[in-house]
From Swiss-Prot:
PANTHER family with a match to the protein in the record: ALANINE--TRNA LIGASE, CYTOPLASMIC (PTHR11777:SF9), ALANYL-TRNA SYNTHETASE (PTHR11777)
Protein's UniProt name: Alanine--tRNA ligase
Binding site for Zn(2+): 561, 565, 663, 667
Matching HAMAP family: Ala_tRNA_synth_B (MF_00036_B)
Subcellular localization(s) per the UniProt record: Cytoplasm
Similarity-based family: Belongs to the class-II aminoacyl-tRNA synthetase family.
Amino acid sequence: MRYMTSEEIREAFLKFFEKKGHKILPSASLIPDDPQLLFTVAGMVPFKPIFWGKVEPVYTRVATCQKCLRTVDIENVGKTPRHHTFFEMLGNFSFGDYFKEEAIEWAWEFLTQVLGVPEEKLWVSVYEEDEEAFRIWNEKIGLPEKKILRMGKEDNFWGPAGPTGPCGPDTEIFYDTGYSKGCPEGEECTPANSEGRFVEIWNLVFTEYYQDEEGKLHPLPRKNIDTGAGLERFCAMMQGVYSNFDTDLFQPIINRIEELTGVGYKTDEEKDVSIRVIADHIRAITFLISEGVFPSNEGRGYVLRRIIRRAMRHGILLGMSEPFLYRIVDAVVEKMGKVYPEIVRGEGMVKEVLSAEENRFLKTLEQGMKVFDEIVEKKGKIDSEDAFRLYDTYGLPLELTLEIAKEKGVEVDVQEFNKYMEEQQRKSRAAMGDVEFARRYEYLEKLPKDFRTEFTGYEKLEDEGEVVLIARDDETVEEASEGTVEVVFSRTPFYAEKGGQVSDTGMVEWRDGKALVEYVFEASEGVIVQRIKILDGTLRRGQKVVLRVDKKRRESTMRNHTATHLLHAALKKVLGDHVRQAGSLVAPDRLRFDFTHFKGLSSAEIEQVEDLVNEWIMEAIPVEVRYTSYEEAVKSGVVALFTEKYGDVVRVVEVPGVSKELCGGTHVKNTGQIGLFKIISEESVSSGVRRIEAVTGFSALELLRNQKKLIDQLKEILGAREDELTDRVLSLREKVKELEKKLSQGRISEKMIAMKQLEDGVKVFHGVFEGVEAKHLGGIADNVLKKEGEGIVILFSKFENKVFLVVKVSENLLDRYDASSIARNIAKELGGSGGGRKNFAQAGGRHPERIKDVLERLEEFLR
């Protein structure tokens, strides 16, 4: 076998299958268009709707190199030669086209003729009942029977993913590395009896059955092929190395880690594990952040945070005490950027998000580890409540807690941890409100097969349609004469909530009745459901109706949607290309846009963005809409949000010279129809994500009117011209502060301040106050000494769960008493620190509840 680089292998695979009539498609996003999955875990994920029979394929033969991410075995990453979080899966797929014979023959041809793998190095396994696959391998390929292993369902039968669904036998191809560890003495080594010698390099799944509720298998009318081969394993095979980490996919990254840490690879096994963990995790981190996933405490963001913090901890084991992961990103981009340009575009963003997260974790890790050690010292174990507190309060992922505990030989009880986690998630969901997509809409099964609602809302706001289905409380009904029901019409001009844009509202009318359309949504692909409230008459299945969209509401929404595209473009121009959409809301009264950026916008930047958007509005640029393939759209430079499916015809909305995005929403005909754009707020949403809210058109006009009314009221109240308002308000604020200070000091001075006389006759005046700022306590102490003439004054103030104190000693007592020493003594008792001069000192503490004890032992602290 000749040495082949990862680039050569990737290209050879795709070219081979292109010659076999396959459509070569780009990798889909790591973020799947599938609510059941957090990440794309296999090459077939983008094609699930096709495998499940929900969508007709555009191409019957497809080949891809798919980005994938799995964390199910994350604790093994770094400890084995082949476990990874991020990996690339090569795959060829057939949707009702070729089947077993071609799939097996082409896999063999690619391995032996294109890659040049010696036949004697290859073994296969088949499902024990799959005689057809056995025959193809034995008779067509000519593989000896002893090299075809018959395996059970656990090893060689795929699916279904749930209790029911598509499934089928598979055949696996193994490569013999020659590594002899684990082979039984006196027996020939095979993939079934050796440990580590044979590596599974390719899995060919023959999806030919459907499993029903009783577990019975039924032949599928259309049989499919789904194959997957790990690029990393192909590289190890073709580059003559045993470990994937020794391939050209990882070596440049490992070299960079060696430079940064000063630790050589393959010098110490424990350190090698840490280097491999970092090399693996930095790839996952780079790709996830570049696709808009940011560290958080739930969902994908939590997985990313786990990966970052695990990599950081292994960096600490290598002696790193400062952020370093962000400095490895360029090695990943240099190696993989040509194949995946999204990481080139997002490099700056990845580094900034990662650097911020590293700094945040380093601040909490020290505190978290201190608490960890305290718990272990006290209990000898970490129970579920402790583990959850370390996660929730100190940011230590459970997996990290488990890993550290294992290293320290400490028992961890995690049985109840998930209950704490589920309760937190339940509260989070409750706070978010009812989530529409959580429903199953089983009543849609009553629709005709392959039914799709005809959407006409791009061209018109009024249309005729027919009632296809009526549902109440998730059950279909033939008619409805009152209350709220969900209805599917044959066609509709009503836009369903999607892509951040809220749904249309309006009216439905028929011969003897009418209903209010309250909400519209797409319950499954292509099926639009309208939630309506019947106002008059009886609505029946088959009824002819007229559907009228609320024109003013739709037009306001259109203004805001096009303005959102302009805002996105303006932010990129003002802040940089790292800006990516991270969420949006397009409503009739306002727009909200979440985007990636790492600090708040200055007033000047906000003005720049506003000016740009309003310039484009005043130019009245025509808004163009066209349909094209996803590939062509991406080639033309369109902004994509990683949610489009393979093969789909996509809708491109373009403002020439300004913006070009994939979008299914409704838009104005030209930018001039937006009228006016005004930002009303800019704030942080989470680490690395900012949010802008803005208004357009009549909402912007209303905002300006209200601001004018407010200014007029202030002018009248303050008796000032508009250009004098700022100075007048600042002057009043200073006067109020001064009056509050005098009032506070005057009132407090009049309060009863306790006095205690020491054995030497010295009087100690003390008092405890609520909410008095530290800067005012000194003035109060001055007032007390002025009134009393001499003595020691010790004053406390409880303020926001903390305590402040001042100590003042009159001049005649300075030879015997030191205010600085007294303040330090008391502060130590209160869990804080302090100091100052001999005659005046200040201090603070974290335990205001200990003040009473201090006063009872006051003389101790004066020594």
